[in-house]
Amino acid sequence: MFTKNFEKISEDKKQMIINKGIKIFSEFSFVEAKTDLIVKEAGISKGLLFYYFDNKKNFYLYLLNYAVDLLTQNLECKTTYYDFFDNIFSIMDKKCNLIKKYPNETKFLNMASKETSKEVEKEIKDIFSQYHKKSNEKLKIQISNSIKIFNLRKDIDHELVVDALSLYIDAIVIKHLNLYQDNPMDLFDNYDEFKNSIRKYLGLMLNGFLNTDCLR
């Protein structure tokens, strides 16, 4: 991506352009965010925008990668091994704190997830794929460490349990995100309710819901 000229400018100016750009794309789609609006808000000329990024698409994708990096930073958590749910929620709490700390970046990702422009569709899909992969890898590490408190049956594959719990948690999260897809930040106003839902669903999975003789 054409950004070497942008990397040469001062950190203060760079951060100002990044913040203004993210705010614009958190409010407008790729097509709706006209170049004239971008340069006006960022306080730079159209010539400088093209000098730094070559075109609007490169600027958009640079900002999207930047936002993803911010929202996936420092997600490693210390595992206590004493309480399964405390361990699982520790990484979710970190994600929640990052989302609260970077609301415009969160709104930008939400806008990007609904982007319909063919010009950036493939690149957005690739970036989001890497975002989910990175998040899931960190969640799986946390799950793997957390289930060490359980006395698993000898015939149970540890990795299979990790995969199953990861898929289950992901499905619960997606369910709740869909409820708040128009205003994703509202989810975190109901964060305790969200965690209680995860606790109930995971408890159902871990404890089972069939009588022991039902499968005989």
Named regions from a protein language model:
Residues 1-12, 213-216:
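N-terminal intrinsically disordered/low-complexity leader segments
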Residues 2, 16, 27-58, 62:
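Helix-turn-helix
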Residues 12, 16-23, 27, 41, ...:
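Alpha-helical structural segments
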Residues 72-82, 86, 120-151, 159-163, ...:
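Amphipathic alpha-helical packing segments from all-alpha helical-bundle domains
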Residues 85-110, 159, 163-167, 195, ...:
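Amphipathic alpha-helical segments that line or abut small-molecule/effector binding pockets
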Residues 97, 137, 141-145, 167-216:
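C-terminal peripheral helix-coil segments that are non-catalytic and often amphipathic
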